[in-house]
Amino acid sequence: GTRYHTAVQLDVGLLLSMHLTSQGDITATGLQPAVYEEQVRQRRRGVRLDEDVRLHNGQRVARPAGVQDAASQFVELSHRLATGQLSTEPGTAIPLWLARPGGVDEWTYDVVGEDTLHLPRLGAVRALHFRPRPLAKPRGPIHAEIWFAPSLQYLPVRIRITQGPDTFMDLLADTIEQQ
């Protein structure tokens, strides 16, 4: 099988430093994460995904089919969109299991619709807006809305990370590099 490695890095000066990494296998059904690590500020936490999921505290929980992690979800959703596995109709609900250091939860993203984003270097870009539903048992106030650009192989061009009613980061793609 073929392996993958993906990383998401955010550095907002002294306010926040966040680094997410995911490694695993590329299979016929999509990405299959094996190791996920996140470092927020100086705190490093991780998850191991084998037959089951080993959380940061050592607890083992069942591994749902197709489970992703906080970094691999962006690549997996882009792939599913680009290959026509997901509907882009507004109102479509897209379920996705996510493994994070504190637990495994089923997230549901709603396709909100299509927006035209004005990106600093890329100009006007049409993008599909995905919004997560609140979790039944939230592990914290953080959630991420994602905009995927059909003209850029459905890569995410905007991610809005919200932590509570008044705190958010709005991340816009500056350049798109593919390897």
What do the PLM-derived regions correspond to, one by one?
Residues 45-87:
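Hydrophobic, well-structured mid-protein blocks that either form specific transmembrane helices
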Residues 1-51, 90-179:
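Acidic, serine/threonine-rich low-complexity disordered tracts
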